[in-house]
Protein backbone atom coordinates (compact mmCIF):
# COMPACT_ATOMS: atom_id res chain seq x y z
CA UNK A 1 0.00 0.00 0.00
CA UNK A 2 2.98 2.34 -0.07
CA UNK A 3 2.14 5.35 -2.26
CA UNK A 4 5.52 4.87 -3.93
CA UNK A 5 4.56 1.36 -5.03
CA UNK A 6 0.78 1.37 -5.29
CA UNK A 7 -1.00 4.15 -7.22
CA UNK A 8 -4.32 2.94 -5.80
CA UNK A 9 -3.41 3.49 -2.16
CA UNK A 10 -6.38 5.80 -1.55
CA UNK A 11 -9.09 3.74 -3.19
CA UNK A 12 -12.06 2.35 -1.27
CA UNK A 13 -10.83 -1.26 -0.92
CA UNK A 14 -9.72 -1.30 2.72
CA UNK A 15 -13.01 -0.30 4.29
CA UNK A 16 -14.88 -3.10 2.51
CA UNK A 17 -13.03 -5.84 4.35
CA UNK A 18 -12.12 -4.29 7.70
CA UNK A 19 -15.32 -2.80 9.14
CA UNK A 20 -16.08 -6.15 10.74
CA UNK A 21 -13.11 -5.80 13.09
CA UNK A 22 -15.17 -3.19 14.91
CA UNK A 23 -17.87 -5.76 15.61
CA UNK A 24 -15.19 -8.17 16.83
CA UNK A 25 -14.21 -5.64 19.49
CA UNK A 26 -17.35 -4.42 21.31
CA UNK A 27 -16.90 -0.95 22.79
CA UNK A 28 -13.12 -1.25 22.48
CA UNK A 29 -12.15 0.67 19.34
CA UNK A 30 -8.49 0.74 20.31
CA UNK A 31 -8.27 -3.04 20.11
CA UNK A 32 -10.33 -3.06 16.91
CA UNK A 33 -7.81 -0.70 15.32
CA UNK A 34 -4.96 -2.91 16.49
CA UNK A 35 -6.53 -6.02 14.94
CA UNK A 36 -7.28 -4.25 11.67
CA UNK A 37 -3.97 -2.45 11.26
CA UNK A 38 -2.25 -5.00 9.03
CA UNK A 39 -5.32 -5.79 6.88
CA UNK A 40 -5.82 -2.08 6.24
CA UNK A 41 -2.19 -1.46 5.37
CA UNK A 42 -2.11 -4.19 2.74
CA UNK A 43 -4.06 -1.87 0.41
CA UNK A 44 -4.51 1.57 2.00
CA UNK A 45 -2.52 4.47 3.34
CA UNK A 46 -3.21 8.02 4.48
CA UNK A 47 -6.82 9.14 3.99
CA UNK A 48 -8.05 5.71 2.89
CA UNK A 49 -6.51 4.23 6.04
CA UNK A 50 -8.05 6.87 8.31
CA UNK A 51 -11.44 6.50 6.65
CA UNK A 52 -11.32 2.75 7.18
CA UNK A 53 -10.48 3.34 10.82
CA UNK A 54 -13.45 5.73 11.07
CA UNK A 55 -15.81 2.97 9.98
CA UNK A 56 -14.19 0.43 12.30
CA UNK A 57 -14.67 2.74 15.28
CA UNK A 58 -18.31 3.27 14.32
CA UNK A 59 -18.89 -0.47 14.31
CA UNK A 60 -17.07 -1.00 17.61
CA UNK A 61 -19.29 1.60 19.28
CA UNK A 62 -22.52 0.15 17.91
CA UNK A 63 -23.21 -1.97 21.00
CA UNK A 64 -25.80 -0.14 23.13
CA UNK A 65 -29.24 -0.49 24.70
CA UNK A 66 -31.83 0.95 22.31
CA UNK A 67 -34.22 1.39 25.24
CA UNK A 68 -31.84 3.88 26.85
CA UNK A 69 -30.86 6.06 23.89
CA UNK A 70 -32.43 6.92 20.54
CA UNK A 71 -30.68 5.38 17.55
CA UNK A 72 -30.36 8.78 15.85
CA UNK A 73 -28.65 10.29 18.89
CA UNK A 74 -26.32 7.31 19.22
CA UNK A 75 -25.38 7.39 15.52
CA UNK A 76 -24.35 11.03 15.79
CA UNK A 77 -22.45 10.37 19.01
CA UNK A 78 -20.59 7.47 17.38
CA UNK A 79 -19.75 9.60 14.34
CA UNK A 80 -18.42 12.44 16.49
CA UNK A 81 -16.20 10.00 18.35
CA UNK A 82 -14.95 8.37 15.14
CA UNK A 83 -14.18 11.83 13.69
CA UNK A 84 -11.29 12.08 16.16
CA UNK A 85 -9.27 9.51 14.16
CA UNK A 86 -9.18 11.85 11.14
CA UNK A 87 -6.25 14.31 11.22
CA UNK A 88 -7.70 17.81 11.13
CA UNK A 89 -5.58 18.84 8.14
CA UNK A 90 -6.65 15.85 6.05
CA UNK A 91 -9.23 16.07 3.29
CA UNK A 92 -11.19 13.28 4.97
CA UNK A 93 -11.62 15.41 8.10
CA UNK A 94 -12.57 18.43 6.01
CA UNK A 95 -15.12 16.33 4.11
CA UNK A 96 -16.67 15.24 7.39
CA UNK A 97 -16.92 18.79 8.66
CA UNK A 98 -18.25 20.05 5.31
CA UNK A 99 -21.02 17.46 5.06
CA UNK A 100 -21.99 17.86 8.70
CA UNK A 101 -22.26 21.63 8.23
CA UNK A 102 -24.51 21.10 5.20
CA UNK A 103 -26.75 18.80 7.23
CA UNK A 104 -26.94 21.25 10.12
CA UNK A 105 -27.76 24.11 7.74
CA UNK A 106 -30.98 22.37 6.77
CA UNK A 107 -30.38 22.10 3.02
CA UNK A 108 -31.83 18.97 1.35
CA UNK A 109 -29.56 15.98 0.97
CA UNK A 110 -29.60 16.41 -2.80
CA UNK A 111 -28.15 19.90 -2.42
CA UNK A 112 -25.51 18.59 -0.02
CA UNK A 113 -24.57 15.94 -2.56
CA UNK A 114 -24.25 18.50 -5.34
CA UNK A 115 -22.13 20.73 -3.10
CA UNK A 116 -19.86 17.79 -2.29
CA UNK A 117 -19.45 17.06 -5.99
CA UNK A 118 -18.65 20.67 -6.82
CA UNK A 119 -16.20 21.17 -3.96
CA UNK A 120 -14.19 17.99 -4.41
CA UNK A 121 -14.74 16.57 -7.87
CA UNK A 122 -14.89 19.88 -9.77
CA UNK A 123 -13.01 22.46 -7.69
CA UNK A 124 -10.68 19.90 -6.07
CA UNK A 125 -10.50 21.78 -2.80
CA UNK A 126 -8.71 20.65 0.37
CA UNK A 127 -5.99 18.95 -1.71
CA UNK A 128 -8.39 16.36 -3.08
CA UNK A 129 -7.17 15.51 -6.58
CA UNK A 130 -8.47 12.02 -7.31
CA UNK A 131 -11.03 13.21 -9.84
CA UNK A 132 -8.14 14.01 -12.19
CA UNK A 133 -5.41 11.67 -10.88
CA UNK A 134 -7.60 8.66 -11.64
CA UNK A 135 -8.29 8.80 -15.36
CA UNK A 136 -10.31 5.58 -15.45
CA UNK A 137 -13.47 7.04 -13.87
CA UNK A 138 -12.50 10.34 -12.24
CA UNK A 139 -11.90 8.70 -8.90
CA UNK A 140 -15.28 6.99 -8.68
CA UNK A 141 -13.72 4.22 -6.56
CA UNK A 142 -11.71 6.60 -4.37
CA UNK A 143 -12.13 6.32 -0.62
CA UNK A 144 -12.47 10.08 -0.28
CA UNK A 145 -15.48 11.01 -2.39
CA UNK A 146 -17.30 7.87 -1.31
CA UNK A 147 -16.63 8.78 2.31
CA UNK A 148 -18.21 12.16 1.73
CA UNK A 149 -21.19 10.54 0.05
CA UNK A 150 -21.55 8.02 2.88
CA UNK A 151 -21.67 10.84 5.42
CA UNK A 152 -24.55 12.44 3.54
CA UNK A 153 -26.58 9.27 3.91
CA UNK A 154 -25.48 8.81 7.53
CA UNK A 155 -26.46 12.31 8.64
CA UNK A 156 -29.57 12.75 6.55
CA UNK A 157 -30.71 9.19 7.19
CA UNK A 158 -30.76 10.01 10.91
CA UNK A 159 -30.62 6.37 11.92
CA UNK A 160 -33.61 5.35 9.80
CA UNK A 161 -32.63 2.13 8.01
CA UNK A 162 -34.61 2.56 4.80
CA UNK A 163 -33.90 6.27 4.43
CA UNK A 164 -30.18 5.81 5.02
CA UNK A 165 -29.69 3.10 2.41
CA UNK A 166 -31.96 4.94 -0.03
CA UNK A 167 -29.85 8.09 0.13
CA UNK A 168 -26.62 6.08 0.06
CA UNK A 169 -27.73 4.30 -3.11
CA UNK A 170 -28.83 7.51 -4.83
CA UNK A 171 -25.72 9.56 -4.02
CA UNK A 172 -23.76 7.92 -6.82
CA UNK A 173 -20.08 7.08 -7.24
CA UNK A 174 -19.38 3.62 -5.78
CA UNK A 175 -22.72 3.82 -4.03
CA UNK A 176 -23.27 0.15 -3.26
CA UNK A 177 -20.46 0.33 -0.73
CA UNK A 178 -21.69 3.16 1.52
CA UNK A 179 -25.13 1.55 1.29
CA UNK A 180 -23.75 -1.80 2.45
CA UNK A 181 -21.64 -0.14 5.16
CA UNK A 182 -24.58 1.62 6.78
CA UNK A 183 -26.97 -1.19 5.95
CA UNK A 184 -24.70 -3.57 7.83
CA UNK A 185 -24.17 -1.21 10.75
CA UNK A 186 -27.84 -0.30 11.16
CA UNK A 187 -28.86 -3.89 10.53
CA UNK A 188 -26.65 -4.95 13.41
CA UNK A 189 -28.09 -2.22 15.64
CA UNK A 190 -31.72 -2.95 14.81
CA UNK A 191 -31.36 -6.73 14.70
CA UNK A 192 -32.76 -9.28 12.28
CA UNK A 193 -36.31 -9.36 13.61
CA UNK A 194 -36.70 -5.59 13.44
CA UNK A 195 -35.37 -5.50 9.87
CA UNK A 196 -37.91 -8.16 8.91
CA UNK A 197 -40.66 -5.95 10.35
CA UNK A 198 -39.43 -2.94 8.38
CA UNK A 199 -39.85 -4.78 5.09
CA UNK A 200 -42.86 -6.83 6.20
CA UNK A 201 -41.83 -9.92 4.30
CA UNK A 202 -39.84 -13.10 4.72
CA UNK A 203 -36.12 -12.44 4.42
CA UNK A 204 -33.68 -14.82 2.78
CA UNK A 205 -31.05 -16.42 4.97
CA UNK A 206 -28.69 -17.34 2.13
CA UNK A 207 -26.58 -15.32 -0.27
CA UNK A 208 -24.88 -16.66 -3.37
CA UNK A 209 -21.94 -14.80 -4.90
CA UNK A 210 -19.62 -15.56 -7.78
CA UNK A 211 -16.83 -13.82 -9.61
CA UNK A 212 -16.61 -13.53 -13.38
Residue ranges of model-derived segments:
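Long, well-ordered alpha-helical segments
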Residues: 25-34, 190
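Hydrophobic, membrane-interfacing alpha helices
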Residues: 12, 48-50
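Short sequence/structural elements of tandem HEAT/ARM alpha-solenoid repeats
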Residues: 30-35, 72-73, 197-201
Amino acid sequence: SSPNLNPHYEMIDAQLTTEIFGLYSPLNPEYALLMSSLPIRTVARENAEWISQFYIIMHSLSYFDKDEIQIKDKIFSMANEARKILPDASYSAKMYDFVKEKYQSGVPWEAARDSLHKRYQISQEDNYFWSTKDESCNGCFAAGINFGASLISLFYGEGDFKETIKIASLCGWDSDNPASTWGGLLGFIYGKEEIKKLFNEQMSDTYNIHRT
